[in-house]
């Protein structure tokens, strides 16, 4: 299940509740150490040298507990008591060219600026440019705010214990946290902490989407309509359509502008492709409609934009709006408040829609989601970027845990919009639209992660082929 994003005080309360039930700190530390070692083995090869930096507190204990489980690895454990004295030891080990570092210097309890000796020690670790696994939080980072205390370890991956700490999701923390993963089965009591921000786990989708009924037919799984593609941007329509196919709605009809009709139709066999006319009546037979991918040409008329605005306001159909079409929406309530609405802005688009700057959006992404949803008909908002958010004006907001920087390539967003739309078009999946959207976002990122594990130079076409198959 999704995990609440919590603050440091809540984590301490959770730990105290666990100790009160009879669980021991030593047992939790032992389990954490075992999981740290498992991750470190996965990220290294046999006979690699792993450097472990262990501080005085429980964070250091977690790191030390990993040592006995690092089979077939050479380990250099440095117990760091004084950074000034131990810096020379660090420099000597770094000359041995370790392949990997485990950072257990400071935990979430750090609440003071680091002195110059600690800053120099951490700077030396960072200057080595080695992959670092941070235990619970990168040393030097404020787990409450995401700011650093003068310096912080730049981790490739952070394994946080129990639940993500709110500061780790702040934009300021991203360069230090790296990829954030949660160690959620380490002997702590079940978490009863309430938080509006939830961390998505793969287990959320263990039995989702549900199995198809044995007598299901094309009509059972809906008819997706797509309005996409214009001169110079026809590839976006193709990618969105192919991604929608991976979601397996019963039928897909794509309407596009006449100058790109042949270029698009020649690439799509199972999608019905039509030329755009002056109204949207063609979509009346659809069970959902995607609007926007590749509609960026200068010859998109004001008449078209106005028709889309009215469609957004008045249609009872589920609508997914992406890319250039987001700029055409008016901040307005819909006349059918029960209708499913989804918008998928990246930070730049969100900033334009909210009439604010991109840094302002990124500084408080949760607030941006709430405000976007409120302004645009209580729509579901997929605020893309690192740790994509999914939510509405009220209720929980979910942080996506999958994905990697290689998603930052042209066509990635078109693929996501198409996959979301292909799922939302299916009537059996519309009852829990939020979960359906979250699944699409997670699957999109998980597919990228699986591709990256196999091949570092994959392209969006590879991503489309993987959608629905990531585990």
Describe each region flagged by the PLM:
Residues 1-69, 76-79, 157, 168-323, ...:
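Small-residue (G/A/S/T)-rich helix-start motifs and N-terminal tracts that mark the onset
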Residues 82-87, 139-143, 166, 325-328:
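Short acidic loop-to-helix transition motifs that present clustered carboxylates
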Residues 98-100, 105-196:
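Internal gly/pro-rich beta-alpha loop/helix module
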Residues 50-51, 58-61, 65-126, 262-274:
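N-terminal small/polar loop signature for handling phosphorylated ligands or for N-terminal nucleophile
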């Amino acid at each position: 299940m999704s995990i609440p994003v919590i603050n440091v005080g809540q984590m301490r309360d959770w730990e105290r509740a666990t100790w009160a039930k009879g669980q021991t700190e030593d047992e939790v530390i032992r389990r954490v150490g075992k999981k740290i070692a498992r991750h470190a083995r996965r990220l290294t090869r046999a006979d690699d040298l792993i450097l472990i930096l262990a501080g005085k507190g429980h964070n250091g204990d977690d790191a030390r507990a990993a040592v006995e489980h690092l089979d077939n690895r050479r380990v250099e454990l440095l117990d760091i008591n004084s950074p000034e004295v131990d810096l020379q030891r660090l420099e000597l080990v770094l000359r041995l060219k370790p392949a990997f570092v485990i950072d257990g210097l400071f935990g979430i309890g750090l609440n003071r600026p680091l002195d110059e000796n600690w800053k120099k020690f951490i700077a030396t670790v960072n200057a080595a440019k080695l992959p670092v696994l941070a235990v619970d939080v990168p040393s030097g980072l404020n787990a409450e705010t995401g700011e650093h205390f003068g310096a912080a370890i730049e981790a490739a991956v952070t394994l946080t214990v129990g639940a993500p700490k709110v500061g780790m999701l702040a934009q300021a923390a991203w360069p230090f946290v790296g990829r954030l993963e949660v160690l959620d089965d380490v002997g702590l009591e079940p978490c009863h902490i309430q938080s509006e921000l939830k961390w998505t786990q793969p287990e959320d989708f263990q039995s989702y989407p549900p199995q198809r009924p044995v007598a299901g037919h094309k009509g059972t799984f809906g008819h997706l309509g797509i309005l996409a593609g214009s001169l110079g941007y026809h590839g976006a329509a193709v990618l969105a359509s192919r991604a929608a196919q991976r979601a397996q709605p019963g039928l897909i009809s794509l309407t596009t502008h006449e100058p790109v009709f042949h270029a698009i139709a020649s690439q799509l066999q199972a999608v019905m492709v039509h030329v755009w006319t002056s109204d949207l009546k063609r979509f009346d037979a659809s069970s959902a409609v995607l609007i926007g991918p590749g509609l960026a040409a200068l010859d998109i008329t004001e008449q078209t934009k106005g028709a889309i605005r009215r469609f957004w306001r008045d249609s009872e159909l589920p609508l997914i709006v992406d890319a250039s079409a987001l700029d055409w929406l008016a901040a307005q309530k819909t006349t059918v408040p029960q209708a499913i609405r989804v918008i998928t802005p990246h930070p730049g688009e969100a900033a334009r829609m909210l009439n604010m700057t991109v840094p302002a959006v990124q500084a408080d992404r949760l607030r941006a989601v709430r405000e976007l949803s409120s302004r645009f008909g209580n729509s579901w908002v997929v605020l893309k970027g690192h740790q994509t958010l999914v939510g509405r004006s009220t209720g929980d907001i979910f942080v996506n845990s999958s994905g990697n920087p290689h998603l930052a390539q042209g066509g990635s967003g078109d693929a996501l919009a198409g996959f979301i739309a292909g799922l939302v078009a299916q009537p059996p999946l519309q009852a829990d639209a939020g979960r359906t959207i979250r699944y699409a976002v997670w699957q999109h990122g998980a597919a990228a992660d699986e591709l990256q594990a196999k091949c570092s130079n994959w392209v969006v076409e590879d991503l489309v082929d993987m959608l629905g198959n990531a585990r």
